[in-house]
A protein has these predicted regions:
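Class I SAM-binding transferase module
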Residues: 2-6, 15-112, 116-354, 358-391
């Protein structure tokens, strides 16, 4: 595989240290996609501080003009706005629902975390008898207006409140739909809400969409990023903050992982079925093994991504956040190692990947990863473990 030359493509804007790779623009803590013609826009510190992700290319998965993202109110810079503009995610749900009319026809649907109500509207178009959308955020005022403007007020009822506190005017529902996934599948997810609603309201032969999820990992080489990151903290406007290096390494990095960085096989570490999963099952420990496929390379850490499936439907679908596929709102998650290790084709890393949720809302995850690196044809081994925390 031909490797791109990253070293000749480095630029510095304002207080962020960027490097460019494969058309992507990175900083130590933010990721931006940009067109070279818009350099002035992205070199403006106010824009850089405000924007969380800009992606201009339909080919990569997002649409929308970033110039309209500021001054439109916090609602439209929120998770809801970004999700609506993730055409990979939205088109997947659209196709799942509208290509399974037989499942939705005359059924009662529960949309958990309905946001703007887009999934509820899809369900109505697919022939659902009635849809109840539950949302705890203040956006429900706008959601009801959207439903009204689309002449669906008789089909869709929006209920404001937490899933554990609201009551439905029906005893059971036939289908639960939700965009329940978070970064790394679990962080910030609504999976506990799905479990609660499933146990309380779902009919015995009902459907959960999506109903299946997996997390996979692979090794990466990304020494440039790590080196630039370390240099940044050594001199922050003349202040030595190098003591923060270990803390930064201990926080999972949510961002774009260009597929060229991947240098090993992949391994699945979690496989869940939404029809049977329990909250206690989401604290897990899984063994893994990956094998490197390039010589004279380095091991900088693990990249994780997730896949979800709609497996019980007549027309089945899946959605992936795999680095080899189009980018989604959820990006990928990278767990950097403290040090880079030299690896060659055939070398292996084995270990365990443990995840614990100390809260009940998945707004914090504690992770422990053990690493055992074995060099093929040599008696050299290195073993250690690291702790990471989503918060």
């Amino acid at each position: 595989m031909q490797r791109a030359n990253r070293g000749n493509n480095k630029h510095y804007y304002n207080k962020f240290d960027y490097w460019h790779y494969g058309g992507y623009k990175y900083s130590f803590n933010k990721k931006y996609i940009y067109d070279e013609k818009e350099k002035d826009f992205y070199s403006n510190e106010n824009n850089v501080n405000n924007i969380e992700n800009v992606q201009k290319s339909d080919e990569k998965g997002f649409t929308g003009n970033p110039d309209t993202w500021f001054n439109d109110g916090e609602c439209f810079k929120s998770k809801t706005f970004k999700l609506r503009n993730d055409i990979i995610r939205t088109s997947c749900y659209h196709d799942v629902i509208l290509n399974n009319h037989d499942i939705f026809k005359d059924k009662v649907v529960l949309d958990i975390g309905c946001g703007t109500g887009i999934l509820s509207i899809f369900a109505a178009k697919a022939g659902a008898k009635h849809i109840f959308g539950i949302e705890s955020a203040d956006i429900t005022e706008y959601t009801r207006e959207i439903i009204k403007k689309n002449n669906l007020s008789d089909k869709i009822t929006i209920i404001k409140g937490k899933i554990e506190e609201v009551e439905l005017p029906v005893e059971k529902v036939d289908i639960i739909i939700s965009e329940w996934m978070g970064n790394f599948l679990l962080y910030g997810s609504k999976i506990d809400k799905i479990i609660y609603a499933r146990d309380k309201w779902l009919n015995k032969d009902g459907y959960i969409l999506p109903d299946h999820g997996t997390i996979s990992i692979a090794g990466i080489e990304n020494t440039d990023y790590k080196n630039n990151n370390e240099k940044f903290w050594e001199d922050v406007y003349g202040v030595d903050m190098s003591c923060l290096k270990s803390a930064i390494i201990g926080k999972p990095f949510v961002g774009i992982c260009p597929p060229e960085l991947i240098n090993s096989s992949s391994c699945r570490i979690l496989d869940i079925d939404l029809y049977t999963i329990k909250n206690e099952d989401l604290d897990f420990s899984s063994k893994y093994e990956i094998t490197f496929f390039r010589d004279n390379d380095k091991f900088s850490g693990l990249v994780a991504w997730f896949d979800i499936g709609f497996t019980k439907l007549t027309n089945k679908f899946n959605l992936t956040t795999n680095p080899y596929h189009k980018l989604t709102y959820w990006y990928q998650t990278i767990f950097y190692t403290r040090n880079d290790l030299k690896v060659n084709k055939g070398d292996k890393v084995t270990g365990s990947f443990a995840v614990k949720n100390p809260k009940t809302n998945f707004k914090q995850l504690n992770i422990k990863i053990s690493f055992n690196v074995a060099n093929k044809g040599k008696n050299e081994k290195e073993a250690w473990h690291q702790f990471y925390k989503f918060f």
